[in-house]
């Protein structure tokens, strides 16, 4: 998925924006100007770092510009303001995360357990590779427009998980109401998100030590539901 947020790789902030052609610095050395796309990636990387550290309300365009090595005016050439910059990081990051999950599930064997494990593994990979973006995605903000965007993105993720559950033959055989499937999607998404947040707070824990317990927690319960198990009265 090609977006300016992808991998959030920083580009050298000492270079000036341009078309990629060589220029001379004050020592006469030849160096290459950054393209507009490269400069935008530099701004996004710096913004993600500042937002992750300061939060949306505490971040300032001046600080982002300084971190990116650009002027405030250059940021406004790419984004209307702080809200659009923040929303861009959140929306692109959420979309990339969900795309990875769905692609991994689709590429796995038809077995539902393997699909779930592949999807969860892809999600944890995203969080590990893009911790700054994930921290921004998970922040609480006071801006109503950002909150509305956050709610919409969360619902899209939950609905995508619910659609995968609904396509499972054993789940379909249980004749669940759509609302019940939707609720399962909410719970699975919530468990994955909480596990990812815990992992970021405990980075010394090996990825396999996160994936294993979370997978067991999700699958053992889900498998019983798929088989029609009921709690005794």
Set out the residue ranges of the language-model regions.
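Amphipathic alpha-helical segments used for helix-helix packing
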Residues: 126-148, 162-165, 194-201, 231
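N-terminal intrinsically disordered/low-complexity leader segments
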Residues: 1-38, 172, 176, 226-233
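Hydrophobic alpha-helical connector segments
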Residues: 88, 103-129, 184, 188, ...
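Amphipathic alpha-helical packing segments from all-alpha helical-bundle domains
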Residues: 95-99, 125, 145-171, 182-187, ...
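Hydrophobic alpha-helical segments that form the core
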Residues: 2-20, 176-198, 209-221
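Amphipathic alpha-helical linker/stalk segments
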Residues: 89-117, 138, 161-169
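Generic hydrophobic, amphipathic alpha-helix propensity
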Residues: 39-48, 64, 85, 89-101, ...
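Helix-turn-helix
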Residues: 42, 50-84, 88
